[in-house]
């Protein structure tokens, strides 16, 4: 199989947070082209009614798979994958889906205090999937679920170069910090792919040091394990396409995409 015959990897997110996963995946799969898809017409996912969001994502993937025929799809969105991942695998059994789920298992393995917080969207927090992960892997820990209504939007704005106020960020992360019987939270799981972009702000404003757990590298490693590596490949150069379901990303977003080696594709609205 020559490099021109290699199918691309599709990376999907509700917005631009999935760029954290794309960045890691490119390091591990330099022989592949990537297609980045941002469902900005539906962003943010956290406030959607579950049935409507499930219907939207399944229909959207029907169009994406038909048009792009990727090798695999990486769902770089906790809210989407915890809701619709199983359904995507049933509806499109010919496709491999690699999902993003809260990194509760590694957090439970690493914590010393036994106090772990999961910083997510409201949608991810209320999923049975998330609670099943806690029951399976962190039953001996005190796990606090923090569903932020605002942080994904704030992170998108920050990535685009807009300023955030310390007080606004501090209010969003404050519930993550718990003290019980002289012990303190020592790990916060970043259960939204937007949040790692703001992790340095979190570190600066945290009331005490914690380990902010970013799952992007683990997701990329999982994807790499499922993608065949051809013999004699050469790393690819050039821009990959970025697709926005609104069909109209603003100038700041286009500039950001360029910084990630992506070129916004000229497509009509998909959403």
Curated annotation (Swiss-Prot):
User: What is this enzyme's class at the first EC digit?
Assistant: isomerase
Keyword terms, alphabetized: Cell shape, Cell wall biogenesis/degradation, Isomerase, Peptidoglycan synthesis
Sites where the protein binds substrate: 13-14, 45-46, 78-79, 193-194
Question: Example GO biological process term?
Answer: peptidoglycan biosynthetic process
The record's section on Pfam families has:
Asp_Glu_race
**Pathway(s) it belongs to:** Cell wall biogenesis; peptidoglycan biosynthesis
The Gene Ontology terms for molecular function here are: glutamate racemase activity
State which Enzyme Commission number(s) the record gives. Answer: 5.1.1.3
Which reaction is the catalytic activity of this chain?
L-glutamate = D-glutamate
Point out the signal peptide segment: none
Q: Where is the active site?
A: 77 (proton donor/acceptor), 192 (proton donor/acceptor)
| InterPro entries per record | Asp/Glu/hydantoin_racemase, Asp/Glu_race, Asp/Glu_racemase_AS_2, Glu_race
Q: What family is this protein classified in?
A: Belongs to the aspartate/glutamate racemases family.
Role this protein plays? Provides the (R)-glutamate required for cell wall biosynthesis.
What name does UniProt use for this protein? Glutamate racemase
Organism encoding this protein:
Sinorhizobium medicae (strain WSM419)
Q: What is the lineage of its organism?
A: Bacteria, Pseudomonadati, Pseudomonadota, Alphaproteobacteria, Hyphomicrobiales
